[in-house]
Amino acid sequence: MKPSYLLQLRIAQWILGTWLVLGLAGAVLPHAPSLLTGLASDSLALGAVLLLAVVIGVPLGALAGSGPRWADVTLAFTTDWIAAVPVVLLLAFLRPAGVSSVGGLVLLGVLRALEVAWVVRSALLRAARLDTTWAARSLGYMPLSIFLSQRLPAAAGPALAHLALTPVWTFLLDAVGTAAGLGAASSPHSLGALVAGPATGMPSAVAAIFAVVALTWSLHRLGDHYGLRLARK
């Protein structure tokens, strides 16, 4: 590996570690500054959303990409329908209905899972076109161990790259929802809500935006690295 690439990995790991430490401090300290509280809120929200996206999205995408035709059609219809309805509009209907912050996180996780599923499905179909043995194996029985070790890693890189955008995605939803008077998508204490709040000063807003952009870059670098490692196995 090139020294510059290794340096980027170290910086990405340092940024992620700093986020976790500051987020823990914001969750533990009784009178933490609003920026630390936002880091803590976003850390918990991102953890929940990413967990749901991986647990639901990867198996769903694998089923659509290498399973029965109806699974692919259903996923395509669902993702097209979700894409036509902005998440902010969904919040406009769900918030007045009394949906809690936990319910909002579940909604974000499910929406992210559908997007990840589509990315995994597309990556598997693209790999099938490049691998001449895929179609032959698909006609018969493909052991689960072969699918997990040889097929699914082909989708690791695109899926991790897509998941790396989750911090910016959540931040923008929180900021737009707060500015529109609908409330933050994940938490009223999030960084997006902090930036869109009327009482937030310029230094805090700039620091919050920088933190989100830095975390997104960090996750993208780490996702690219580990995605390549999985694809080479």
Regions found by a protein language model. Name each.
Residues 119-155:
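Short cytoplasmic-facing helical segments at TM-TM junctions of multi-pass membrane proteins
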Residues 2, 22, 26-30, 45-79, ...:
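Transmembrane-helix boundary motif in ABC transporter permease subunits
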Residues 43-52, 56, 144-177:
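Transmembrane alpha-helices
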Residues 51-53, 92, 96, 179-181, ...:
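Hydrophobic alpha-helical transmembrane segments of polytopic membrane proteins
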Residues 68, 108-111, 157, 164-165, ...:
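C-terminal transmembrane helix and the adjacent membrane-cytosol boundary/short C-terminal tail
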Residues 56, 66, 71-118, 122-126, ...:
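Generic hydrophobic transmembrane alpha-helix motif, especially the helices
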Residues 1-13, 25-51, 194-209:
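Periplasmic/extracellular loop-to-transmembrane helix junction in inner-membrane transport proteins
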Residues 92, 100-101, 105, 109, ...:
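Non-cytoplasmic
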